[in-house]
């Protein structure tokens, strides 16, 4: 039998081809998926500076509008603009094209991750098994926790900022390992900085870029083999660090403002939650991420926190698991330190790679991020396992068995099982109804998921009885004005006498002050009720106010037809 290392050397493209094939097998089905109600529409076809496609006016707006959607990500919005234009030109369904772009971005990131891990191992003078690195990259690429960022159009920002981060760090590594500071090295430095800026413009999470660049620098200085050249801190490198930290600081300010001054909502405090709640959330979220990496069960959209800002799955258990996992890793590193030179520096680097980009999402540095954790937040941090595999030397017996193929095949089967779970998990993201029905299966008391399921039942299958039941249950658990308006619209559509009376009770304040309904849904419901009762003048007033509502996001055709009918009746 040929050794696995021999097969690796047969062609340098074989590992990358295997990565591409695995990702496409698991995620290609996402191209046929529809939209998810959370953010997909608000970022794309209902976004006023995206829906009309690419134009300089729209580009200026996406750079200067810091409040839309609670996040500043101009480069990501520009890609959505291009999506709109491509869909119009080619006639391809918009959702299909957007999902295709997401899948291709994930393919690119998986390729770049494998490339970067091999490059850093080579730069460090490590001779570990390349097949172990490949298996780790496969594990990352097709793990069930990758489903959310790949199958959710709104998560384009995750893959874009990671794409530019990986590219930038590859250029940074090329600069650090250059033997001569010539024009090529300077070009690599400039490209690394450009990628840093681009990543920050895709999502503010990229503010961690200079810290990751510094981690690469320190790793090469402290953990490389003795015969490997150690990069110093040249004036060029220091200037680049300063520039990157300035960009990161500006991005952090923009992120804080966007999260606390969301368009259409009242401004909120940056540190609204008590510090001890933020600490509990951070530790329990880490526990969940560690647990889900091993046992990815119960993953779903919009994971919520229950009253008191504690995780649904129990803070104590998750915190205990997080602490136990970190202690176990430290114990293994301590025992392995003599058999694997550089193990400590490799583990410290991998730990920094995991913790630095995920820290802003944990809620410690501000209350945004305190209400939930999400699989998408681990998209870049989880790559730490690939770098750990590349930088740590395996025991000789494990290397031999990997080379013979026995251990490799066993591990590959395990990775394939995770890929199978990811394929199944992707099926829960077909559309908004399926995604939130899955959320209710995992968390039966999820009030926002009830609203989304109710929307689908009323709009798609006209099952108003079940849809209204979901709205009522959501209101009982968490009263919200927008849910009350949806309930009124569904009641008006069902059209019973008792339904009409309830709509008038629910919308009494809106009748007196129509400006309270920014989206026009309650106004439309009231107009429908007054129309059914023959009060044409009041119905006309309600329909006109509904059509003119500044935050209306749904089609106006049906409302206009009802308005025309009322006007015709008066004549």
What are the residue ranges of the model-derived segments?
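Polytopic membrane enzymes that build or remodel cell-surface glycoconjugates and lipids
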Residues: 2-459, 463-490, 495
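Structural marker of alpha-solenoid helical repeat scaffolds
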Residues: 442, 477, 513-515, 549
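TPR/Sel1-like alpha-solenoid repeat signature
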Residues: 450-457, 470, 484-491, 506, ...
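Alpha-helical repeat scaffolds
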Residues: 467-470, 499-512
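TPR/TPR-like (Sel1-like) alpha-helical repeat modules
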Residues: 475-476, 540-551
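Terminal, low-structured helical/coil segments at or just beyond the last alpha-helical repeat
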Residues: 550-571
């Amino acid at each position: 039998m040929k050794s696995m290392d021999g097969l690796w050397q047969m062609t340098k493209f074989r590992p990358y081809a295997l990565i591409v094939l695995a990702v496409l097998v698991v995620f290609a089905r996402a191209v046929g998926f529809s939209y998810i109600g959370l953010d997909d529409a608000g970022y794309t076809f209902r976004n006023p500076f995206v829906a009309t496609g690419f134009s300089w006016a729209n580009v200026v707006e996406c750079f200067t509008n810091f409040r839309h959607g609670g996040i500043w990500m101009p480069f990501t919005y520009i890609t959505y603009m291009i999506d709109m234009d491509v869909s119009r030109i080619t006639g391809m369904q918009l959702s299909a094209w957007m999902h295709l772009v997401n899948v291709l971005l994930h393919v690119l990131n998986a390729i770049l991750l494998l490339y970067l891990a091999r490059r850093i191992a080579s730069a460090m003078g490590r001779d570990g098994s390349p097949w172990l690195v490949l298996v780790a990259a496969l594990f990352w690429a097709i793990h069930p926790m990758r489903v959310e960022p790949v199958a959710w159009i709104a998560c384009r920002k995750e893959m874009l900022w990671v794409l530019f981060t990986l590219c930038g760090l590859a250029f940074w590594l090329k600069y650090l390992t250059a033997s001569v500071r010539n024009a090529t090295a300077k070009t690599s430095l400039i490209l690394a900085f450009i990628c840093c800026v681009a990543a920050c413009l895709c999502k503010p999470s990229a503010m961690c870029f200079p810290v990751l660049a510094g981690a690469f620098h320190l790793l090469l200085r402290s953990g490389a083999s003795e015969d490997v050249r150690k990069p110093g801190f040249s004036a060029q490198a220091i200037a680049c660090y300063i520039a990157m930290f300035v960009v990161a600081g500006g991005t952090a300010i923009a992120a804080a403002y966007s999260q606390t001054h969301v368009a259409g909502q009242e401004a909120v405090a940056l540190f609204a939650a008590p510090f001890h709640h933020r600490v509990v959330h951070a530790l329990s979220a880490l526990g969940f991420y560690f647990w889900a990496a091993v046992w990815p069960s119960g993953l779903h959209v919009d994971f919520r926190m229950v009253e008191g800002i504690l995780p649904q799955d129990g803070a104590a258990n998750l915190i205990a698991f997080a602490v136990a996992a970190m202690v176990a890793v430290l114990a293994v590193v301590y025992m392995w330190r003599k058999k694997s030179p550089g193990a400590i520096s490799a583990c410290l680097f991998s730990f920094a790679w995991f913790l630095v980009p995920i820290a802003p999402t944990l809620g410690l540095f501000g209350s945004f991020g305190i209400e939930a954790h999400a699989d998408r937040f681990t998209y870049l941090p989880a790559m730490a396992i690939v770098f750990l595999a590349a930088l740590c030397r395996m025991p000789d017996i494990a290397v031999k068995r990997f080379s013979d193929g026995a251990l490799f095949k066993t591990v590959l089967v395990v990775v394939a099982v995770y890929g199978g779970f990811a394929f199944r998990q992707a099926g829960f993201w077909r559309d908004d109804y399926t995604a939130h029905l899955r959320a209710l299966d995992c968390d039966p008391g999820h009030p926002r998921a009830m609203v989304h399921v109710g929307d689908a039942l009323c709009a798609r299958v006209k099952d108003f009885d079940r849809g209204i039941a979901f709205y009522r249950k959501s209101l009982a658990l968490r009263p919200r004005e927008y849910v009350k308006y949806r309930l009124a619209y569904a009641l008006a559509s069902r059209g019973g006498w008792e339904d009409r009376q309830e709509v008038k009770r629910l919308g009494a304040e809106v009748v007196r002050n129509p400006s309270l309904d920014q989206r026009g849904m309650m106004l439309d419901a009231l107009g429908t009720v007054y129309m059914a009762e023959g009060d044409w003048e009041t119905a006309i007033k309600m329909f006109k106010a509904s059509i003119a509502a500044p935050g209306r996001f749904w089609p106006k055709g049906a409302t206009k037809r009802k308005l025309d009918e009322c006007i015709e009746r008066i004549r």
